[in-house]
């Protein structure tokens, strides 16, 4: 019978994986004799048996959903997970949600050329090396209290549901070139240390920036003249916009 894992791997303390030499299960063992791509192999086995909760797991080799069959309406949970290698989803059509609460991505988070038809949540997390969500369709993207210590690319991506970024720190460039937002876009309590590119962005409902500081060059500069976009306490290209909706609000009153 397999031993109980000494680390909590998912929503249960009973780990069905055998205990390894150092007393930990194979996924947490970090010795030189650790098999290559063990994290991906275990992920593959778990998905085949309908297990989608990968919380508290440690990946030394990264993670990819390549060639894995995911059931419809699956909830992919990666809470408190750590990825030393890149996390990659490429060219996939998935009716699945992803929860990256309290996760760390040391070598990048990549979801490209994909259609994700349920919600993606990134909360209390850290992303380094690269963040690339380009050339994709997402149902909704909710990100809260997260440090993005790298370039962030959302170019040529369509968000069909809500897009909410709150309390986010961008250490490098931010790219939304040619992005499409079919529902509300909310960008609050944000610092962008370098350049931001919002050229050719299309939005269908509300687009709101509040308590945002763009320290680098912002494109297009003409955004400050568009009163259909809400700007409240926003620093853009060295100019502070306290409230570009004030005239409209005064008329209503």
Report the location of each language-model feature.
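N-terminal leader/targeting and pre-domain segments
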Residues: 1-253
């Amino acid at each position: 019978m397999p031993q109980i894992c000494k680390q909590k791997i998912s929503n249960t303390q009973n780990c069905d994986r055998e205990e390894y030499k150092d007393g930990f299960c194979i996924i947490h063992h970090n010795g030189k004799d650790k098999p290559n791509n063990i994290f991906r192999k275990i992920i593959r086995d778990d998905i085949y048996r309908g297990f989608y909760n990968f919380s508290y797991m440690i990946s030394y080799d990264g993670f990819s959903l390549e060639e894995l069959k995911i059931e419809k309406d699956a909830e992919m949970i990666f809470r408190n997970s750590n990825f030393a290698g890149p996390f990659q989803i490429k060219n996939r059509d998935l009716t699945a949600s992803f929860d990256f609460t309290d996760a760390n991505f040391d070598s990048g988070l990549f979801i490209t050329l994909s259609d994700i038809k349920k919600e993606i949540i990134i909360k209390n997390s850290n992303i380094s090396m690269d963040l690339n969500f380009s050339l994709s369709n997402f149902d909704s993207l909710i990100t809260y209290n997260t440090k993005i210590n790298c370039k962030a690319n959302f170019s040529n991506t369509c968000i069909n549901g809500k897009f909410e970024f709150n309390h986010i720190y961008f250490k490098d460039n931010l790219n939304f070139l040619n992005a499409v937002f079919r529902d509300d876009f909310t960008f609050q309590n944000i610092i962008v240390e370098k350049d931001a590119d919002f050229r050719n962005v299309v939005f269908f409902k509300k687009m709101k920036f509040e308590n945002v500081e763009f320290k680098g060059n912002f494109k297009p500069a003409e955004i400050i003249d568009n009163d259909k976009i809400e700007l409240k306490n926003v620093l853009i290209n060295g100019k502070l916009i306290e409230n570009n909706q004030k005239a409209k609000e005064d008329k209503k009153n």
